[in-house]
Regions:
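Exposed, tryptophan/tyrosine-rich binding patches on extracellular proteins
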Residues: 70
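Short S/T/G/P-rich N-terminal loop/turn motif that feeds into the first structured element of a domain
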Residues: 1-61, 75, 102-158
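Extended, compositionally biased
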Residues: 64-67
């Protein structure tokens, strides 16, 4: 059985400890709890920080890394767009500066696997270099677990 791994990166406007990031930091725990209770959620990366977010340094920038595993694309989509997470997603420009797209990568893994940040960043580099493929794909240009391109099913964002 395969599960869907997803990673996204976002360049923070400021460190998470700064006042301008306060609204986001306060929302991290509640939104993560919603994810964990969502149908189809399997796992997410947690850091030792109190807010559970993983931040990397990239040059002089703070880059937030989100990494999770889901039973299916539909489960991930429901959380991203149909839960309270969607409201924060629509306001992301308050906390994050634009990055080289894409900033989200998906790939299929064996059930029970737990991808790491290094693998996620490698998959994202592969996607940015080679475009969507069964090894690394996007929310809009997906691949099935067997490697076939996903058919364009329209999923509502409401």
């Amino acid at each position: 059985m395969l599960h869907l791994a997803q990673a996204n990166v976002a360049q923070q406007r400021a460190p998470l400890s700064s006042p301008e990031m306060g609204e986001l930091v306060v929302a991290l725990d509640p939104v993560n709890r919603i994810a964990e209770r969502s149908q189809g959620f399997v796992w997410r990366l947690r850091s030792a920080e109190s807010h559970g977010a993983t931040t990397l340094w990239e040059g002089s920038s703070h880059v937030l890394v989100n990494l999770s595993v889901w039973e299916s694309y539909e489960a991930l989509h429901a959380f991203v767009y149909r839960s309270p997470h969607g409201a924060y997603l629509r306001r992301r420009a308050r906390w994050f500066t634009p990055m080289r797209p894409p900033s989200t990568v998906l790939w299929w893994i064996e059930a029970g696997e737990r991808p790491g940040v290094e693998e996620a960043l490698r998959r994202l580099r592969h996607l940015r270099t080679h475009g969507p493929s069964p090894q690394a794909f996007t929310l809009r240009r997906r691949f099935e677990p067997d490697g076939r391109p996903a058919t364009r099913q329209r999923l509502s964002r409401s």
